[in-house]
Amino acid sequence: MARKKVRPRLIAELARRVRALREQLNRPRDSQLYAVDYETLTRPFSGRRLPVRAWADVRRESRLLQLLGRLPLFGLGRLVTRKSWLWQHDEPCYWRLTRVRPDYTAQNLDHGKAWGILTFKGKTESEAREIEHVMYHDWRLVPKHEEEAFTAFTPAPEDSLASVPYPPLLRAMIIAERQKNGDTSTEEPMLNVQRIRMEPWDYPAKQEDKGRAKGTPV
C-alpha cells in the first residue's frame, strides 16, 4: 500500500504553529515584564528606569490589579478611574469592569489584564474592550456609595450655529475676488464655524488599533 504523501504546505503550516506556540510559551509574564524595583525605580526585566515624573505616583499610587486583588471576584462590576483623568476632565471618565484575568504567577496576584466598558467625558461606549495601561500607578477605585454621584452627568447643549458672516473687510475682499473671476453670484459669503470632532489626547486607544507600545510604562 502506497504511503500517503504529506503536502509541503501542511508541513509549513505545522512548523508555523509550533514556532508560534514556542514564542507564546517563552513570552515573559506580566509579573516579570512590569515588575518594579521600588528602591532604584527600574524595571528589572528591561533594566529601564521609570520617568522622573512618575516616581511620586509609583511610591504612592497603585496599579489596577493591585486594587482589584483586594476585592471579591476581583471587583467585577465596580468602577475604576485614573488620577490623571480626575485632574484633566470635569466630565466623568471611568471603566466599568466586566472581566479580569490575573497573572497567577504573580506573588500577590497584582498583575494581569482587565476588560470593561469605557465612559469617557460622559460618553459611554457600547462594547467592552481590554483596558490599557493597567500597569500604570495611578488607578483609583470609585467607592460604591459614591458611584451614583460620580457617574451623574448632564451633557451641555450642542451649539447649532454652523456659519457666521465674514468681517466687513474679508467680505469685501471675497466679493472683489468673485468679480475679478467673473463670478456673478449674489450669495452672501459665510464663514463655517462648525468644530471638527477630535478625540482627546488621553482617550484610551483600542488594543487592536495600535502596535506594541514603546517607552517605559509607569
Curated annotation (Swiss-Prot):
Source organism, top-level taxon: Eukaryota
Keyword line: Disease variant, Mitochondrion, Primary mitochondrial disease, Ribonucleoprotein, Ribosomal protein
Residue ranges of the TM segments: none
Keyword Ribosomal protein set for record: yes
UniProt similarity note: Belongs to the mitochondrion-specific ribosomal protein mS34 family.
Classification via PANTHER family: 28S RIBOSOMAL PROTEIN S34, MITOCHONDRIAL, SMALL RIBOSOMAL SUBUNIT PROTEIN MS34
Protein task: Required for mitochondrial translation, plays a role in maintaining the stability of the small ribosomal subunit and the 12S rRNA that are required for mitoribosome formation.
Oligomer and partners: Component of the mitochondrial small ribosomal subunit (mt-SSU). Mature mammalian 55S mitochondrial ribosomes consist of a small (28S) and a large (39S) subunit. The 28S small subunit contains a 12S ribosomal RNA (12S mt-rRNA) and 30 different proteins. The 39S large subunit contains a 16S rRNA (16S mt-rRNA), a copy of mitochondrial valine transfer RNA (mt-tRNA(Val)), which plays an integral structural role, and 52 different proteins.
Protein name (record): Small ribosomal subunit protein mS34
